[in-house]
From Swiss-Prot:
Binding-site positions, substrate: 56, 147
Induction section of the entry: By phenylethyl alcohol (PEA) in the olfactory sensory epithelium.
InterPro entries the UniProt entry points to: Aldolase_I_AS, Aldolase_TIM, FBA_I
Lineage: Eukaryota, Metazoa, Chordata, Craniata, Vertebrata
Name used for this protein in its record: Fructose-bisphosphate aldolase C-A
Pathway linked to the protein: Carbohydrate degradation; glycolysis; D-glyceraldehyde 3-phosphate and glycerone phosphate from D-glucose: step 4/4
EC nos: 4.1.2.13
Species whose genome carries this gene: Danio rerio (Zebrafish)
Length: 364
């Protein structure tokens, strides 16, 4: 007979479940603003802005100063370590700004990917060392949930069984550690869109990966009601010549989830995976309109697909801040509708909303 040591108390479980429910309340999703310094550098470079701490702070401020229209759209914001301790121009901590809106604070806790020996260029995610101590500190500093990202690619030889198993175990250990400190773990096993594979192949690999993840979660005694899943939508590879409808993407995605994700999981918060803002919203709405039974909240945890138009509008200029914030609010409202299956094509995807955000081997 196996047991969890130390076991979570009834009070701990209640807190974790309530946090998870709050994040994915109807119509709400997650703003992923946890890009690393290097990833922010790539974004800022695209608009000709220097990558320094002040410019990173200014852009995060554009997002965080959104008015109360986002209160019913955003249930959680994922911070990067640097951002957790930054303030607005007025000296108000970003954490306080977000919490005052009734939005839950999250924190990225992984330390990035490293090569996995014995594989054909595959990776595992590091950061378990010292994670318990970091979680304890982040909880004191206002964070109630965390995110950990593992990455896999589809090719003729990948993902290998070794890669899938190793990353599943790492995700489960991370989740267990978080829960001991009252932090809801977001489990993110991302399958990259790199390659020319079709929809069926992506669905098969997604099912393999998610099945392994939840086997590991069970083995590590993770309390599923106090977790969220952040998977890729099931989409064809970026180089696939076949184009699929949003309804086909939705059916493949929901089918994969139904075959692998226990109903006890509180919510599924999809990553955008390099899709354009508009494409991600359309697919999310289609997923929520899929006629199959869906026992979880199905919503968004978008980074680029919430920020691209705002970033393009801002361009590092003070006079553009208000307009950039409006662009962010617009995307938040659209994705709120999409998470309820109520969004239809807006008709204009010629600007930033229609631009693909695909980057080969994308890393945060």
């Amino acid at each position: 007979m196996t047991h969890q040591f130390p076991p979570l108390t009834t009070e701990q479980k209640k807190e974790l479940h309530e946090i998870a429910l709050r994040i994915v309340s109807p119509g709400k999703g997650i703003l992923a603003a946890d890009e690393s310094i290097g990833s922010m550098g790539k974004r800022l470079n695209q608009i000709g802005v220097e990558n320094n701490e002040e410019n990173r702070r200014l852009f995060r401020q554009v997002l965080f100063t959104a008015d109360d229209r986002i209160d019913n759209c955003i249930g959680g914001v994922i911070f990067f370590h640097e951002t957790l301790y930054q303030n607005s121009d007025d000296g108000v901590p970003f954490v306080k700004m977000i919490k005052d809106k009734g939005i839950t604070i999250g924190i990225k806790v992984d330390k990035g990917v490293v090569p996995l020996p014995g594989t054909n260029g595959e990776t595992a995610t590091q950061g378990l060392d010292g994670l318990s101590e970091r979680c304890a500190q982040y909880k004191k500093d206002g964070a109630d949930f965390a995110k950990w990202r593992c990455v896999m690619k589809i090719s003729e030889t990948t993902p290998s069984n070794l890669c899938i198993t190793e990353n599943a175990k790492v995700l489960a250990r991370y989740a267990s550690i978080c829960q001991q400190h009252g932090i809801v773990p977001i489990v993110e096993p991302e399958i990259l869109p790199d390659g020319d594979h079709n929809l069926k192949r992506c669905q098969f690999v997604t099912e393999r990966v998610l099945a392994a993840v939840y086997k590991a979660m069970f083995d590590h005694h993770v309390y599923l009601e106090g977790t969220l899943l952040k998977p890729n939508m099931v989409t064809p590879g970026h180089g696939c010549p076949t184009k699929y409808s949003a309804e086909e993407v939705a059916m493949a995605t929901v089918t994969a989830l139904r075959r692998t994700v226990p109903p006890a999981v509180t919510g599924v918060t999809f990553l955008s995976g390099g899709q354009s803002e508009e494409e991600a919203s359309i697919n999310l709405s289609a997923i929520n309109n899929c006629r199959l039974v869906k026992p979880w909240a199905l919503t968004f945890s978008f980074g680029r697909a919430l920020q691209a138009s705002a970033l393009k509008t801002w361009r590092g200029q003070r006079e553009n801040e208000a307009a950039a914030t409006e662009e962010f609010i617009k995307r938040a409202e659209i994705n709120s509708l999409a998470s309820q299956g109520k969004y239809t094509v807006c008709g204009d995807s010629s600007g930033a909303t229609g631009l693909s955000h695909y980057l080969s081997s994308y890393a945060y």
